[in-house]
C-alpha cells in the first residue's frame, strides 16, 4: 500500500470519527429508579379452558439450521425452544474463550404463546401435544382438540439470513369472539461488557396510521410502558446490537400493551421486554395467519432489507435532520471500508 493510499484511509477514518463525535445522538443520562404501575391487556379469566386430546405424546425436538442461525422447535405446544446466532457470541463467552453462538431466544426464560377463543372455551396452543414432521427446511406440527378439531403450525427457515416464517392454521376450529391473544416476552441477557448500556433495551413498533415509528423510552433504570389502542404493523425487541422482531403478514395487530422493566438486582436477566398483543380472530379464521420473525443483528444493511414497512428504523442512524447524509453517504462508505478490512471495528449507531 503506497503513501497516498495510507493518507487517504487515515483521512477517511478521521472523518468518520469526527462525525461520530460531533453528530451522533448523545446518550440520555439514566434517571433515578422508580416504579410505574401499568395497565396490561390480558384475556378474560371467566372463560373455561377447553379440554385437549388426552393422548400424551412423547416430546420431539426438531432443528432447522442455515448459514446464520439455528432454530430448535418442540412438539410440545409446537413452540420455539431456542434461536441461536451462529456467527456471534456474547461478551462472557468471548472472555472465556468459548465458541458457542449467541442466543436471542431461549424457552427457559422467554415466551411466545397464543391463546384462541373457541366455543368450548379458551385454548392455549402451548398446552397442546403436536405431532411433528420435518421436510428439509420446514417443520409442520398438527395438534388435535378433544372435540376432534385440528390446529396446524408450521415453521420455514430460508437457506440464509435471520428470518423465520411461522404459520398458525386454525381454520377448522370454531373460533368465537372477536380477538385472540399473543404473549411475547424476552428476558434480555448481558451480551456486551457495559451492562448499563444493555439495560437500555427497548420495544419498537410501527403504527398502521401513517406508518408512524415509535418506541418505549430507553431508560436503563425505570419501567417504561405503553398501551397501544390502535393497530400496529410490527413490534420488535431492540437491544444495543441485536434485534428480535414479530411481523404479521397481510394483517395488523389490533392493539398491544408493551412494557420494558429493568431488573437492577439481576445480573443474568437484566431487563424484561413484554408485549401482550390482541389480534383479530376473524383474520385468523380467514387464513390471515402468517408471521415472520426476525432474530439477528441490529445492522442497518440487513434490517433495512426486511420486507416490512420502515423496519430499517429499528437502527438509529442519527438525528432526523442528518439522516439523508448518514443514509446515503456514511452508510455506503462504511460498507465499502468493511469490504476492505475484515476486522473493521468502528461502528456508527
Language-model features, listed with the residues they occupy:
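Interfacial loop/helix-cap signal at membrane boundaries in integral membrane proteins
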Residues: 294-344
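Short, Gly/Pro- and small/polar-rich lid/capping loops
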Residues: 38-62
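Membrane-interface junctions
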Residues: 3, 284, 339-343
Amino acid at each position: 500500500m503506497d503513501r497516498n493510499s495510507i493518507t487517504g484511509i487515515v483521512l477517511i477514518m478521521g472523518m468518520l470519527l469526527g462525525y461520530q463525535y460531533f453528530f451522533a445522538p448523545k446518550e440520555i443520562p439514566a434517571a433515578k429508579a422508580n416504579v410505574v404501575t401499568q395497565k396490561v391487556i390480558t384475556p378474560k379469566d371467566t372463560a373455561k379452558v377447553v379440554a385437549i386430546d388426552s393422548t400424551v405424546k412423547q416430546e420431539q425436538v426438531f432443528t432447522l439450521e442455515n448459514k446464520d442461525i439455528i432454530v430448535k422447535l418442540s412438539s410440545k405446544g409446537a413452540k420455539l425452544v431456542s434461536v441461536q446466532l451462529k456467527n456471534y457470541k456474547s461478551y462472557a463467552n468471548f472472555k472465556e474463550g468459548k465458541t458457542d453462538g449467541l442466543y436471542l431466544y431461549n424457552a427457559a426464560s422467554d415466551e411466545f404463546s397464543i391463546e384462541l377463543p373457541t366455543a368450548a372455551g379458551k385454548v392455549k396452543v402451548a398446552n397442546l401435544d403436536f405431532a411433528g414432521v420435518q421436510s428439509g427446511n420446514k417443520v409442520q406440527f398438527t395438534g388435535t382438540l378433544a372435540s376432534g378439531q385440528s390446529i396446524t403450525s408450521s415453521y420455514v427457515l430460508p437457506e440464509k439470513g435471520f428470518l423465520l416464517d411461522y404459520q398458525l392454521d386454525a381454520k377448522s376450529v370454531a373460533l368465537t369472539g372477536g380477538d385472540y391473544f399473543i404473549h411475547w416476552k424476552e428476558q434480555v441477557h448481558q451480551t456486551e461488557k457495559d451492562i448499563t448500556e444493555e439495560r437500555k433495551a427497548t420495544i419498537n413498533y410501527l403504527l398502521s396510521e401513517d406508518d408512524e415509528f415509535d418506541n418505549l423510552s430507553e431508560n436503563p433504570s425505570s419501567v417504561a410502558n405503553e398501551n397501544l389502542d390502535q393497530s400496529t404493523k410490527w413490534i420488535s425487541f431492540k437491544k444495543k446490537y441485536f434485534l428480535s422482531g414479530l411481523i404479521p403478514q397481510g394483517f395488523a395487530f389490533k392493539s398491544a400493551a408493551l412494557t420494558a422493566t429493568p431488573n437492577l438486582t439481576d445480573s443474568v436477566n437484566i431487563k424484561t421486554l413484554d408485549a401482550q398483543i390482541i389480534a383479530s380472530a376473524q383474520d385468523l379464521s380467514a387464513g390471515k395467519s402468517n408471521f415472520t420473525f426476525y432474530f439477528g443483528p441490529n445492522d442497518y444493511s440487513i434490517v433495512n432489507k426486511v420486507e416490512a414497512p420502515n423496519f430499517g428504523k429499528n437502527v438509529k442512524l442519527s438525528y432526523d435532520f442528518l439522516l439523508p447524509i448518514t443514509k446515503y453517504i456514511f452508510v455506503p462508505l462504511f460498507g465499502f471500508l468493511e469490504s476492505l478490512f475484515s476486522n473493521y471495528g468502528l461502528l456508527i449507531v
